[in-house]
Amino acid sequence: MGAFFRDEVAGPLGADFHIGLPESEDARVAELIPPVIDMANQEFDPNSIAGRTLLSCLIDATEPRTREWRGAEIPAAGGTGNARSVARVHSALACGGTVDGVRLMSPETVERVLEQQSDGQDLVLELGVRFGMGFGLWLEDWIMSPNPRHFFWGGYGGSIALVDLDTRMSLAYVMNRMDSELTGDTRGKSIVKALYDSTR
């Protein structure tokens, strides 16, 4: 998976993002600072679906500091990069599949991301969510953009990736100091707000 991503996506886009970081790049990595309240210390009912899910596979927030983690090719959770590289990869989606002359997919494929796959209560996050193909979609409670044709997702610690098809913008926020929230933190949300405030 790492070689495919490097050869077909990151390389052609010039994105400094890796799924399976080569050991030669370790010195460039800024260490993550674990959240004040880590997952094990969150107040979950251990018998709830959220508790059984999140507490059954705890990841020590210091684990990404290890060579084994960095080198592992874990597409859903093990990528290594900076905000610029995450936004660069997502810019291909924001620009209809082609950015700076590099075509990764057709405009029709990009539009398929908006096809709703589910809409309802997420029993782990314990809130309403809508999913398209691989991303969260516009929802009253989760308005990331004033434009309904946007999609997004985030990661443990507070990272955010946002794609807005109407404005052809992508935005990413990644952090070293992890937040304890499961659904994004105020730092990333404030950057999203500032972006849209500046485009009015």
Located regions from the model:
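Short, surface-exposed loop or secondary-structure junction motifs
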Residues: 1-143
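Short basic/hydrophobic patches in alpha-helices and adjacent helix-turn junctions
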Residues: 95, 137, 150, 161-162
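Short amphipathic alpha-helix initiation/capping segments at coil-to-helix junctions
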Residues: 79, 124, 128, 152-153, ...
